[in-house]
């Protein structure tokens, strides 16, 4: 039976993130207490409410945040779900896209807006541009008139990234800084966003203008970041880290509501989306 203030939610869709796989394999920054259910986010439908619940009703769709989403049903305090606007009967495509709202699109929005005040016509550079976060950065930047230099590690990705709204696509390598300068006609670059670490981070930092900001949110290369102190001293490069879990812990509720209020309508309207590769049932975990 439900405790006072709890709701029962049927899980409609929940994505598989690289961080989930890292956590399962014991390689993530924080180890969960066992037994633990993986999963970071998703979308569900309220199927039962308890006394004391006023803002959620049976049949309402909600975003799942806070972990443990790889299951058929979740029982949790009503306050731990984010209510969605009335969507009628959304398509399975919209349900899938909404299930990915709370991690990657939110990360992209916050990194795009929290560190540097970019204006229409400004440039940014980011690595792992073909990742899910990278795709959302491209789409959100395009909607704001911000131009993107999109760094990838292999050929054959330019067409997809340009179709999302990317302006320049470059392959990472030793001459990347010169490539960026050439492709953008030496445009000032105030923001770099990196998920790779190692030499890629350094090259992005070297491409920034004086006072530019580097934001690190991943280390896909497994390599530490090296920066010549001269870049910090003479170019006044700032280095910031971004971890979404910390934002969820510390951001005021009004800030969270404002962020979701920007993202959800874009996803529902189809203006913001990610590619879905494969679909699995919970019992199909071995195939996944």
Go through each PLM region and give its residues.
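Mid-domain Rossmann-like dinucleotide-binding core that forms the NAD(H)/NADP(H) cofactor-binding site
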Residues: 102-174
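Glycine-rich beta-strand-centered segment in the early N-terminal region that forms part
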Residues: 1-15, 27-68
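C-terminal hydrophobic helical "lid"/dimerization subdomain
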Residues: 252-288
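Short, glycine/polar-rich helix-capping loops at beta-to-alpha or helix-loop-helix junctions
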Residues: 69-72, 152-160, 224-229
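Cytochrome P450 core scaffold surrounding the K-helix E-X-X-R motif
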Residues: 19-25
């Amino acid at each position: 039976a439900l405790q006072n203030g709890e709701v029962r939610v049927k899980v409609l869709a929940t994505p598989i993130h690289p961080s989930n796989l890292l956590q399962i394999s014991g390689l993530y920054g924080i180890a969960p207490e066992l037994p633990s259910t993986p999963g970071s986010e998703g979308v569900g439908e309220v199927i039962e409410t308890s006394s004391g619940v006023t803002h959620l009703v049976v049949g309402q769709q909600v975003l799942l945040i806070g972990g443990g989403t790889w299951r058929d049903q979740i029982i949790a305090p009503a306050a731990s779900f984010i209510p969605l606007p009335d969507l009628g009967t959304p398509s399975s495509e919209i349900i899938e896209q909404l299930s990915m709202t709370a991690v990657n699109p939110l990360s992209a929005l916050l990194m795009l807006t929290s560190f540097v005040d970019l204006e229409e016509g400004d440039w940014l550079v980011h690595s792992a541009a073909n990742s899910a976060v990278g795709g959302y950065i491209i789409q959100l930047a395009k909607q704001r008139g911000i131009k993107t230099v999109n760094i990838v590690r292999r050929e054959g990705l330019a067409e997809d990234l340009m179709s999302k709204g990317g302006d320049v696509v470059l392959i990472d390598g030793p001459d990347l800084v010169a490539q960026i300068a050439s492709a953008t006609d030496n445009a000032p670059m105030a923001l770099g966003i990196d998920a790779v670490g190692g030499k890629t981070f350094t090259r992005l930092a070297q491409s920034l203008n004086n006072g530019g900001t580097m934001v690190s949110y991943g280390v896909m290369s497994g390599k530490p970041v090296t920066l010549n102190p001269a870049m910090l001293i003479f170019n006044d490069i700032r280095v910031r880290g971004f971890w979404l879990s910390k934002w969820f812990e510390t951001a005021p509720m009004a800030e969270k509501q404002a962020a979701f209020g920007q993202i959800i309508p874009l996803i529902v309207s189809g203006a913001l989306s990610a590619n879905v590769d494969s679909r699995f049932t919970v019992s199909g975990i071995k195939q996944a």
